[in-house]
């Protein structure tokens, strides 16, 4: 980790309902490339005395000319709360969720079955396709 990289948090909020701390993160990195998210996660985990697996960072934008990047971070109280509240795509980037992918042929057959019916019956046709 670079010593010249500074991480500041602002708009800090403790969200008791979702068991997390949420904040806007400013990363100051003058004369350097954008800092990797993994590095930011590790530094935030050290700041809030927790492990990096419960820290979720996203939405980073580097200002024109570089030197400053702003994003959003959430630090959960435990991994269970994180799995419950975080969107699936964000869990997937952490390696905590894997989507069950059906074969292309099954998806196409299901799509074609759904084309043959109209309105709310599509749901029952789609569900029947999942059972097989």
Swiss-Prot record:
Keywords: Cytoplasm, Ribonucleoprotein, Ribosomal protein. Residues 91-132 are annotated as: Disordered. One of its GO terms (molecular function) is structural constituent of ribosome. Component of the small ribosomal subunit. Residues 96-112 have a biased composition (Basic and acidic residues). The keyword Ribonucleoprotein applies. This is Small ribosomal subunit protein eS24. The keyword GTP-binding does not apply. Belongs to the eukaryotic ribosomal protein eS24 family. It comes from Oryzias latipes. Component of the small ribosomal subunit. The ribosome is a large ribonucleoprotein complex responsible for the synthesis of proteins in the cell. Required for processing of pre-rRNA and maturation of 40S ribosomal subunits. GO terms for cellular component: cytoplasm; ribosomal subunit. It is found in: Cytoplasm.
């Amino acid at each position: 980790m670079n010593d010249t990289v500074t991480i500041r948090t602002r708009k800090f909020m403790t969200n008791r309902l979702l068991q997390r701390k949420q904040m806007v993160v400013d990363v100051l990195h003058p004369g350097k490339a954008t800092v990797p998210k993994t590095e930011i996660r590790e530094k935030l985990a050290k700041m809030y005395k927790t492990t990096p697996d419960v820290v979720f960072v996203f939405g980073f934008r580097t200002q024109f000319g570089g030197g400053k990047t702003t994003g959003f971070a959430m630090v959960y109280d435990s991994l269970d709360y994180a799995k419950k509240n975080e969107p699936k795509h964000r869990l997937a980037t952490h390696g905590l969720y894997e989507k069950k992918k059906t074969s292309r042929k099954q998806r196409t057959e299901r799509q074609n079955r759904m084309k043959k019916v109209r309105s709310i019956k599509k749901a029952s046709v789609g569900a029947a396709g999942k059972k097989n």
